[in-house]
């Protein structure tokens, strides 16, 4: 059985909602295509997972490492991932030195309070993380230009980028998150 790990940090709950929508997209696509051999797990980085600025959940890292694909998610804070997500990233250095994530599928998602809130920098940071680990990055193949009802309303192709509207997620963001989950399954099925 193949598996997907969605690892993310969320403070206000919007990144959590995106992670759950991605999980729903994976499950829906798998069920619709009679592909029940894909397991998807979410791993939320919580305050108790950080001690003295360091991510300390080695068991979580081991579970994530067992996955065939990893989808990274963080809110955009000051043009990058949150400090808590950065602590998780720093904890992957031992995984990097062993090459344990090499050739795994990777994707990413982020949310900010404004569309011009430098979310692309966050996605590029996640993409760099994946590249350093030798992972294969999956972006969105929907530019948002083909039709007006596309889920990718930001037009970003590197990953899922969205923003809140009055601290709420627009329906399009949840649809785009589901689409990202489906896309990762499609790509993963080719390996």
State where each predicted segment sits:
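N-terminal beta1-alpha1-beta2 submodule of the flavodoxin-like/Rossmannoid cofactor-binding fold
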Residues: 1-100, 147, 153, 161-191
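Short, glycine-/small-residue-rich phosphate/pyrophosphate-handling segment
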Residues: 105-151
């Amino acid at each position: 059985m193949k598996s997907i790990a969605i690892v993310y940090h969320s403070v206000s709950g919007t990144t959590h909602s995106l992670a759950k929508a991605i999980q729903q997209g994976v499950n829906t696509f798998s069920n619709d295509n009679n592909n029940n051999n894909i397991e998807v797990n979410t791993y939320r980085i919580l305050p108790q997972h950080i001690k003295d600025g360091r991510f300390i959940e080695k068991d979580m890292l081991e579970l994530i490492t067992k996955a065939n694909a990893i989808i990274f998610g963080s809110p955009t804070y000051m043009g990058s991932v949150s400090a808590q997500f950065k602590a998780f990233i720093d904890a992957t250095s031992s995984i990097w030195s062993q090459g344990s994530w090499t050739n795994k599928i990777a994707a990413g998602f982020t949310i900010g309070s404004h569309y011009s809130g430098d979310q692309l920098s966050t996605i590029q940071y996640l993409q760099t993380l994946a590249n350093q680990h030798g992972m294969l990055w999956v972006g969105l193949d929907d530019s948002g230009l083909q039709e007006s009802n596309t889920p990718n309303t930001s037009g970003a192709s590197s990953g899922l980028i969205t923003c809140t509207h009055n601290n709420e997620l627009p329906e399009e963001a949840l649809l785009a998150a589901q689409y990202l989950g489906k896309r990762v399954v499609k790509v993963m099925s080719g390996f």
